[in-house]
Amino acid sequence: MASFSAETNSTDLLSQPWNEPPVILSMVILSLTFLLGLPGNGLVLWVAGLKMQRTVNTIWFLHLTLADLLCCLSLPFSLAHLALQGQWPYGRFLCKLIPSIIVLNMFASVFLLTAISLDRCLVVFKPIWCQNHRNVGMACSICGCIWVVAFVMCIPVFVYREIFTTDNHNRCGYKFGLSSSLDYPDFYGDPLENRSLENIVQPPGEMNDRLDPSSFQTNDHPWTVPTVFQPQTFQRPSADSLPRGSARLTSQNLYSNVFKPADVVSPKIPSGFPIEDHETSPLDNSDAFLSTHLKLFPSASSNSFYESELPQGFQDYYNLGQFTDDDQVPTPLVAITITRLVVGFLLPSVIMIACYSFIVFRMQRGRFAKSQSKTFRVAVVVVAVFLVCWTPYHIFGVLSLLTDPETPLGKTLMSWDHVCIALASANSCFNPFLYALLGKDFRKKARQSIQGILEAAFSEELTRSTHCPSNNVISERNSTTV
């Protein structure tokens, strides 16, 4: 996903995917998010940071606005990335930085919203403690810790994002050793139809398009690997067209692979790759072949085939791709996705829902002033909007780990992945408008200054605890800010 957040390859892009509804919808969402979110968050940051008195609530929402503003600043790069059909013209550093900013926004926002929820809960259930300990300094310290944790959660994105070159264009994606995952994989065509061996995804600087003729030799099996100097086109072979006992060719997910140069391998090994009598019955060159598009498996008639039977150096060819010979998703990709789901969504969501449920229950039982629900209402709606925007992103991320991209469901997930990323980014433009609409009556707010609107939304007003005695002195001590 990343990344913004999410993440096969076609030479001509005949399908013109940027004309498809999901891509158009994504571009519209990203454009509106940038046009509305940048001035909106910038205005809130300027007024709340420079014009308003610093309170605990102001600190919370000030840092939340800063996270949203950083996300909005990265949106032009994401929009251009989508408009260029997955091409990345901004270089390696921004390939790492831009997705990291989007993930940073996600973690910082959800951690800040969780802190706001816990703060609301403490105000209601522990008013005396809040009266003595809840202050601006503590809020700033908590926000600082939140930013540190959010930066730590971005490290995997910054480490694993790399530039790949395909069709003479740079593309940005994840690289896990010999495995890779490009952004916007549905921009690329069928990897086995009308594909030239020149158009192979390669990390720049790591391998050349043309190599000198060479061969791999082992003591057990003589493997001759002539280098292909001219573009070759391979069509998907049928199972019946292959000789009995020959190695069958299975399509590999090119959109998620990093490939070596275009080599045609002519193994002189026993038919079916048997282990016992591997020094007899050499095959001719037509019995089996392997291109860098394809993955090699022994036929049903063969005995067990081990990767160690391959000559040294060719084993790297065998394991290229996002999936290994057991069709397993790379462990780092699984770890990144699950961590985002649990730490960046499920756990904070449970905490926020529990906090606001307890608050609603207590408010229904107690005597709370109408003004007390002001910031509470703003916080609840902000949390709800966050969950709506980010839920599809995490669902699609998990499904992408469990679904074969070549199935109809997998292709649908790839097509709508852009929309999920755009919707998650759109969360960064909603909050300024929520602040303006939820404090007081909208008609009154329309006549107020921006500073007055924000002061109403982030107000720190005294309210009375539900269990305060009638004694005025004790009642005043039990009052706290909301």
From Swiss-Prot:
Keywords: Cell membrane, Chemotaxis, Disulfide bond, G-protein coupled receptor, Glycoprotein, Membrane, Phosphoprotein, Receptor, Sulfation, Transducer, Transmembrane, Transmembrane helix
Record bears the keyword Cell cycle: no
One Pfam family cited in the UniProt record for this chain: 7tm_1
GO biological process terms, semicolon-separated: blood circulation; calcium-mediated signaling; chemotaxis; complement receptor mediated signaling pathway; G protein-coupled receptor signaling pathway; inflammatory response; phospholipase C-activating G protein-coupled receptor signaling pathway; positive regulation of angiogenesis
Modified residues (Phosphoserine): S459
GO CC, alphabetical: azurophil granule membrane; plasma membrane; specific granule membrane
UniProt membrane topology term: Multi-pass membrane protein
Extracellular topological intervals: 1-23, 81-96, 161-340, 401-417
Cell membrane as UniProt keyword: yes
Tissue expression from the record: Widely expressed in several differentiated hematopoietic cell lines, in the lung, spleen, ovary, placenta, small intestine, throughout the brain, heart, and endothelial cells. Mostly expressed in lymphoid tissues.
UniProt modification remark: Among the sulfation sites Tyr-174 is essential for binding of C3a anaphylatoxin. O-glycosylated.
Glycan attachment sites: N9, N194, S266
Entries under PROSITE patterns matching the protein: G_PROTEIN_RECEP_F1_1 (PS00237), G_PROTEIN_RECEP_F1_2 (PS50262)
Subcellular compartments: Cell membrane
Cysteine pairs bridged by disulfides in the record: C95-C172
Family (UniProt): Belongs to the G-protein coupled receptor 1 family.
Summary of subunit composition and partner proteins: Interacts with VGF-derived peptide TLQP-21.
Protein name: C3a anaphylatoxin chemotactic receptor
Gene name linked to the record: C3AR1
